């Protein structure tokens, strides 16, 4: 952690700018989860459940 602090001081980056950047990065991760990961997961679960039902009903005939 000390190395990062020294890097910020040497690069003349303010703590406010570093904080804003970190908040933006976390916000991007949350947005990606909401827009991509969660819908894709729900779709894959839905498809796998339907496939399981189709295989089960086909096997009984």
Swiss-Prot record:
Belongs to the PsbX family. Type 2 subfamily. GO terms for biological process: photosynthesis. Involved in the binding and/or turnover of quinones at the Q(B) site of Photosystem II. It comes from the Bacteria. Signal peptide: none annotated. It is found in: Cellular thylakoid membrane. It is a single-pass membrane protein. PSII consists of a core antenna complex that captures photons, and an electron transfer chain that converts photonic excitation into a charge separation. PSII forms dimeric complexes. The keyword Nucleus does not apply. The keyword Transmembrane applies. This is Photosystem II reaction center X protein.
